[in-house]
Amino acid sequence: MIQITLPDASKREYPQAVTVAEVAASIGAGLAKAALGGKVDGKVVDTSYLIEKDSALSIITAKDADGLELIRHSTAHLLAYAVKELFSEAQVTIGPVIENGFYYDFAYKRPFTPEDLAAIEKRMTELAAKDEPVTRRVLPRDEAVAHFKSIGEHYKAEIIASIPANEDVSLYREGTFEDLCRGPHVPSTGKLKFFKLMKVAGAYWRGDHRNEMLQRVYGTAWATKDELQQYLTMLEEAEKRDHRKLGKELDLFHIDDHAPGLVFWHPKGWTIWQGVEQYMRKVYQDNGYQEVKGPQVIDKTLWEKTGHWDKYRDNMFTTESEKREYALKPMNCPGHILIFKQGIKSYRDLPLRYGEFGQCHRNEPSGGLHGIMRVRGFTQDDGHIFCTEEQILKECVDYTTLLQKVYTDFGFKNIIYKVATRPDARIGSDESWDKAEQALIESLRASGCEFEISPGEGAFYGPKIEYTLKDAIGRQWQCGTMQVDFSMPERLDAEYVGEDGARHRPVMLHRAIVGSLERFIGILIEEHAGALPTWLAPIQVSVLNITDSQAEYAREVAKTLQNQGLRVNLDLRNEKITYKIREHSLQKLPYILVVGDKEKAAGAVAVRARGNKDLGVMSIEAFAQQIASDIAQKA
């Protein structure tokens, strides 16, 4: 007898080995129809998987996260099937699931066109409607190599040839198409109903620029029509908010081919930058951080001690001078330890908090660069706290409270909290890990935060809290971090004198709130669709005259507001006022002030707020009070 334990702890017995599909059918016809796969003792499998011993089983449907993964994986195969039907000379390579969808790489004699993409998607819909069964078979490695060579699929043959000779490989077939795959997959193509092909791009075989260029077709797939439509609507909204597009329209910054992955800030963009930096500098000052500054170029011997030279060298920019090798720093932490080590530190000095607006460089691959969100040169609000194990809890509580205030001030209300715990490969004693993990968890509880545990996702040198922002259109951005580090103080021999007179290692807490300022400003631009809150807006108010006779009065108004510390633009051009209002509105300014003869005579201004709101005529003093209130409230 085979005993199956279901998620509700109920048990079912079967006289002999049984498939996942058969168990689903024995529970009910509805479940049998909805089943996409199963999870047997924690492992996701096909519905055809044969259970031969007592096991725990949950049936996977489209409502489950694993079900969506199965749908996307199988839709990637459906894409390859359709391409082979329409372009028989194309060779298939790989097709993994990615966030929100999948892609598949093809070798073909020419790039696919938008018309090709439409035809492929149409063929996918037709193949799905045929509801062809998806079946699995297993072959010895060499047999599988010979099979794919015989049908002209040389990329597949190359992939399989790299697998150890004594291993078998699994193949999945739907209709006339068969592909190498570990699986699992949905039971038939009819389960794949809600998908869309998004774009085609170039990609090198095996990610190596020395290899052939392939065609990468991206797609998305969802469990329901509504979810697909919501995702496509979100993408449309994201396109309108794209910081690269808004950066150009609002004249904030540009990226130049002369310096790929590095940002040229224009005056208005740099004003935003300075606003963020000055705000964060005040955060340092108000919360017991001492601001420091370290060099950008550091001898490789330091990076050898920290382990970066072994593990991270490919991502570092290096240079040589006088027969010494140097690297542009990819992170600030080693420099802060060198500062900590200057002079004897006592337990009375702890916790010691350093903060730096540290410029870092990382040699990101060109394909991964994205506007100002993913760059090669960036500045972090990088802080490091040197403390004892007993001080971790309070430092984390204080940090979380501070982070929440900062995010609220920038307009973010929705924060997701995750605690990443010890991985199998780690340094430090279990006792130290217990203390650190407990401190992180207790700090979030003390702050009233709901959080998730991510088992095994901590770094080898310590656990961490990840703080993720959810933006106006539901996207998630991981910005803040609180990382416990037992390793680097040891590697770089940081010490303090304890109450007992002996030397001890401090614990190092790496913390960032906004992270990369470049990336955070990109997130801000997209969150607010370019209409930044008044306190951050590069131009807070534009003063417009209607005719030349009000020009001098307009200058006086602008000067008065500038003297109050406001960022003011004065537009005295001889253009129609409607044209000027429209032009400044497109720049998403918080306020536009119009002055005509009536306003001049009354010593007043006509006020328009963002969103084409007419606030009527105000005295200059009343307007100044209103905008000052906006700034004070971070509105």
UniProtKB/Swiss-Prot annotation:
One of its GO terms (biological process) is threonyl-tRNA aminoacylation. Pfam families: HGTP_anticodon, TGS, tRNA-synt_2b, tRNA_SAD. GO terms for cellular component: cytoplasm. Residues 242-533 are annotated as: Catalytic. Zn(2+) binds at C333, H384, H510. Belongs to the class-II aminoacyl-tRNA synthetase family. This is Threonine--tRNA ligase. The lineage of its organism: Bacteria, Pseudomonadati, Pseudomonadota, Betaproteobacteria, Burkholderiales.
